[in-house]
Amino acid sequence: MTVKTALRQGYDLLAEAGLAEPRLTAEVLLLHALHRERIYLYSHPEHELSTLEWLHYGRYLHERLKGRPTQHITRVQEFYGRPFRVSPATLIPRPETEHLVEQALQTAGGARTLLDIGTGTGALAITLALELRARAVATDLSFDALQVARHNAAALAAPVDFVQCDLASALTGPFDLVVSNPPYIPAAEMATLQPEVRDYEPHLALLGGEQGTEIYHRIVPQAERLLTPGGWLIFEIGYQGEAGVRGAFAHGPWQEVSLTCDLAGLPRVLRGRYTP
Ligand SMILES: C[S@@+](CC[C@H](N)C(=O)[O-])C[C@H]1O[C@@H](n2cnc3c(N)ncnc32)[C@H](O)[C@@H]1O
């Protein structure tokens, strides 16, 4: 069995099962079995798979066909050009969340200290700490997620401290920038999620209460306690979350509250400036 034939067979199986991106998935799973970089698939199409490589590739395809996310099989997802370990305890970082990074770099490029609330893999805290050359603190309720985030920070040499607590309740600050991509799926929508999300990703990372915006109303007052005057609070929001999250900013000392949409044109990032 050559690389070329293995790719074709993997593609056929995944495409027949109706899975998204069958070619890319077959490539990623085969590379994982071969322990190679992507270029190898095209520079060595006649490479004969060893028995072990073939067995591993077959097992990965089988797991994917049963619904397991590719990133849970390879245990890695790229975010803003860097590899992040993922686990069943962490949300798989999404490309849409890179929009928050871009907005934070544009809006708060001078931040020296930042806080990421609900850090998961650490994707936001680590990326922003490295891009801004800032010191970061990141929180999560999940001990297992924080273990993964700590691993990622060490692997990427990012200056991030991790704290297990409810939102930012254990912290004193001050911070120049607070970011958060909290759970924001309304309870009624959980059943409608793709099975690969609903059945494999942690509900602690997904479920945002009845409306999906309640957690933002808890974060905003905490940010008021922690931000330096003039500092920014920047949220990722769900596609229906804008009005509810704007409401969270409405009664406090917030100015320059504004929304940006992602590449798909969906409301994605809402920010406000703490102006006491
Ligand atoms: C949507 S995920 C975002 C993860 C990561 N920031 C990202 O963008 O990929 C939300 C994260 O918030 C954490 N979380 C949920 N409720 C929390 C709470 N009350 N306090 C702290 N973290 C919480 C979850 O464990 C999860 O890691």
Model-derived features: positions:
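A general structural signal for well-ordered alpha-helical segments in protein cores
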Residues: L7, A26-E27, W54-G58, T70, ...
